[in-house]
Amino acid sequence: MYAFLHHYYVVSSVRSDKSRIIDPCGRILAQTDWWVNVIYRDINLDYVVAHYDFNYSIPDKILKAYPGRVKVKSYTDDSLFLVEPIDDSITTKQLQEEFGFESAAQYFQRHREAYKRILEGKPPLPQKAAHGDRPQYAKTD
């Protein structure tokens, strides 16, 4: 549960037939079974999980700017997307600065702080996020 909440990769090795490699969004990428008892997969530890709010156009913009150099996986049921550079010369920090998006962890923390103030009877502070004035639920050019 901790790994899912904090968006970590999980690589398990068990004696039964269900060893797994799980991505930061909880999806099984590889799994052993009765016939396949060894699995492997490259894992890029420079990745970012982001929330779609205010970022609907970001995956398309990244893929257009860096074709074949950055992998973006979409998990719309969870309102998340995963960004992983394939090219070693590109970092997620660079992509976040260039396209103005924050990690899901930053997004959720901003909301926790706002909710805390509301519960204390105070107005939430103005949101200062990487997205600026982008629309919450729409793609932009």
Task: Locate the predicted segments by residue.
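CN hydrolase (nitrilase-like) catalytic-core segments centered on the catalytic cysteine
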Residues: 1-72
